């Protein structure tokens, strides 16, 4: 976007790829933990899922157990996936299944069950960004309302676990 705004490019291709299925579960866990603050969260039981479990526990302590809400979200997401021919997971899982701990839906890192967590899989996405004059001549185009880059404090010990200040800040100027 910077290159287009500076008139150094008229069209750009942005590509993102993630290949996770060719490495061991241990390696995947280590890669994902790279998105946390390793000096403090590197040994968290359950790995990166354990970091989110810590956040969920703090949220439940503050607002009450909301496991049923997580199950409703999981069931809704699976239902939406069934309606999307491009969705990775196209299997309907009902609320009762998502809200129960079982052999097929165990705790990954309590209180998070398998249906509360994303799958380890491969994926890719691409986006073409164009100068407004070129984009307006296309049959289908979108415009960005805003663009924002913010940082958040990574160590959970240095912030309120139930708040994501970076996400909040990113919405200020929309």
PLM region descriptions:
Residues 1-18, 50-84, 127-133:
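Active-site-proximal alpha-helical scaffold in enzymes
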Residues 172-174:
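Conserved small/polar residues in nucleotide/adenosyl-binding loops
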Residues 30-31, 39, 62, 71-75, ...:
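Condensing-enzyme catalytic core mediating Claisen C-C bond formation in acyl metabolism
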Residues 1-11, 19-51, 90-119, 150-152, ...:
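Conserved catalytic cysteine-centered active-site region
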Residues 16-17, 22-24, 28, 74-88, ...:
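Acyl-CoA/ACP chain-elongation machinery
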């Amino acid at each position: 976007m910077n290159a287009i705004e500076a008139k150094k490019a008229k069209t750009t291709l942005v590509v993102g790829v993630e290949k996770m299925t060719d490495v061991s579960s241990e390696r995947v866990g280590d890669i994902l933990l790279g998105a946390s603050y390793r000096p403090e969260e590197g040994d968290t039981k359950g790995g990166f899922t354990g970091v989110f479990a810590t956040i969920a526990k703090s949220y439940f302590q503050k607002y009450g157990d909301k496991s049923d809400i997580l199950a409703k979200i999981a069931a809704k997401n699976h239902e939406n996936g069934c309606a999307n021919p491009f969705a990775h997971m196209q299997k309907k899982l009902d609320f009762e299944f998502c809200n129960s701990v079982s052999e097929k839906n165990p705790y990954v890192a309590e209180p998070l069950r398998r249906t509360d967590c994303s799958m380890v899989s491969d994926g890719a996405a691409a986006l073409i960004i164009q100068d407004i004059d070129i984009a307006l001549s296309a049959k289908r185009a979108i415009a960005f309302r805003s663009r924002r880059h913010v940082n958040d404090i990574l160590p959970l010990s240095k912030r309120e676990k139930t708040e994501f200040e970076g996400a909040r800040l990113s919405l200020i100027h929309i």
